[in-house]
Amino acid sequence: MSIKEHDCVVLTADLPKEGLKAGDVGTVVHIHGDGVAYEVEFMTFAGKTIAVATVEASAVRPVGERDVSHVRELQSA
């Protein structure tokens, strides 16, 4: 399944610099090349953007039909 702009994706690896963890969900806002990397926006459930990160294709996957949301509190920097 290919990932397109505006798709929800799940991190498969931590991004410590951005304070993000595997399992966090974001929205693709730009595709680099032929999908070698994605610009992904991560937000709180309240709608506040917490990070926009360039993520390699190997570090994200599409949201699946059987995925369930899970809440974690964002740690302060």
PLM-predicted stretches and their roles:
Residues 3-66, 71:
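Basic/aromatic-rich interaction segments and small domains that mediate binding to polyanionic partners
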Residues 75-76:
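Extended, low-polarity transmembrane helix blocks
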